A protein has these predicted regions:
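N-terminal beta-alpha supersecondary unit
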Residues: 1-49, 171
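Flexible, glycine/charged-enriched surface loops at secondary-structure junctions
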Residues: 191-195
Length: 218
């Protein structure tokens, strides 16, 4: 979780065996205490909207909806892959963000530069390594989580020009979500209400995929 105030940021991260749902609210209260603020002082919210873990996305969104219930403060829905790519600040040229999607696949998107909100180079989707290797530009930097490392290894065998960045850059950074969210909220029309938000899974849950015959969301 992170809080932006002026030009500074306060961020709390954790790696705990406890369920995400048990850690999130206490961390939010700790964050506000560190900044000597109350929840009522917060002008707007940003959330990493997906793709990602079904459970993680649901917990995060349910928590935000609880905080914003009956509230008119704006919410920014930040694409998760854009936030991950933003961690490669200082890189020049295209940067692709990869997250483990299991089944030998990754969620991926490619951006013209770190900090871009729109995946103009390659739109977010679910890829096998061979398909992704055929579509990434030359010398693309790769931001990846631990689970995507096997895919990145195969990618680099197919495309030696690709540049995997340190795995530490692929860890979730709430401050990146907050900074992109603030940019979204600078355009009032882009702000969302709590009841209009839905997780961006990309890959449909198995039951829905079977019912619709479509494994991916539009």
């Amino acid at each position: 979780v992170a809080l932006l105030s002026g030009g500074g940021a306060v961020e709390i991260t954790w790696d705990s065996p406890r369920p995400h749902s048990e850690r999130l609210l206490p961390a939010l209260h700790q964050l506000l205490a560190l900044a000597s603020l109350r929840l009522a002082d917060v002008a707007g919210f940003a959330i990493s909207i997906g793709p990602g873990s079904f459970t993680g996305l649901r917990v995060g969104l349910a928590t935000l909806k609880g905080l914003a219930f009956g509230d008119s403060r704006p919410i920014a829905a930040v694409p998760t892959l854009a936030a991950r790519a933003a961690a490669a600040e200082g890189e020049s040229g295209p940067v692709a963000a990869l997250l483990d999607a299991r089944r030998g696949e990754v969620y991926a998107a490619c951006f013209a530069a770190p900090g871009a909100l729109a995946a103009d180079v390659l739109a977010e989707s679910v890829f096998r390594p061979e398909a992704l290797a055929a579509q990434l530009p030359q010398q693309t930097a790769l931001v990846l989580d631990d689970g995507a490392a096997p895919c990145a290894q195969k990618l680099c065998q197919l495309r030696p020009d690709l540049r995997p960045l340190p795995l530490s850059l692929g860890r979730p950074r709430a401050a990146c979500v907050a900074r992109l969210g603030r940019r979204i909220l600078e355009t009032p029309a882009a702000a969302r209400s709590a009841d209009s938000l839905h997780p961006r899974y990309l890959r449909r849950p198995a039951a829905e995929a079977l019912r619709t015959g479509q494994p991916l969301e539009p």
